[in-house]
């Protein structure tokens, strides 16, 4: 088997039919500026909302960037449970905003701490659920509490990994006027290379986000592939998610048996505390063709590794074998 890239939380392979969609693209599409409205209408229908409540973006990153540009400036702040997706802080600071970190590790969602942190200068409150890199989730009650505490500030609900979780907060979020939902086709839908994300919010919020970034954010072939991906249905997505959930449980069991400490996760990855064995384990895995993610310099994560789940039997067996061999080769000292 060739190397396993288990450091980027990739989804499963999209269906073969998408290659037919690529072959059938109209060359005229390539010389015209792209139109995202057809994809926005399809996404709106999926969630039972008007198209004016949907904005297609260049992946989730573009969506987060637009929210920060629209809501933050010098003197305004983002309340951010940490550890979190690194681009949150990056885009907040690019927009001139400050970041107010709220620790969220193995315990429940830090709703009370967020309530205390929100103030007149708060522009954005972030809820990443499932959280990256921990895999922890917030509940509907948590989201409602954040929305109430945020007042006029925007609540950014990052749902990039929600297909892998037991619960989906999108429907509840759509009933809360200050919540903006970020979702993507990059993870469970397998289109990371196309850079297709989207935002759900009120018409006023969506209009502001549309104006906060460049026009034509998503290339025409990516829009076409997004439409084809959704038209192909969800059966393969559900099958992929089922495999990943089974792998997640099995990986946590194996890591525990090996004397490591996996964090509970509802995403397509597991964060594992390795203690003094972290460096040796990462080196051992790399030597066996398995790349995982380390977090040097990230407070509280210095000796943790994040392992993506491949969603494929042969690849998962290779991962387990590499773990056993790496620890047996000296990482367990």
Regions found by a protein language model. Give the residues of each.
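N-terminal small-domain helix-loop-helix segment of the aminotransferase-like
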Residues: 1-62, 66, 333
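Hydrophobic "anchor" residues on beta-strands that sit immediately upstream
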Residues: 3, 77, 124, 154-155, ...
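Short acidic capping loops at alpha-helix termini that bridge into adjacent secondary structure
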Residues: 50-54, 75-77, 121, 159, ...
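PLP-dependent aminotransferase-like
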Residues: 70-127
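Active-site phosphate-binding strand-loop segment of PLP-dependent enzymes
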Residues: 106-163
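PLP-dependent aminotransferase class I/II
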Residues: 178-256, 260-263
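Conserved PLP-binding catalytic core of the aspartate aminotransferase-like
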Residues: 244-245, 256-288, 309
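PLP-dependent enzyme catalytic core of the Aspartate aminotransferase-like
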Residues: 284-288, 297-333
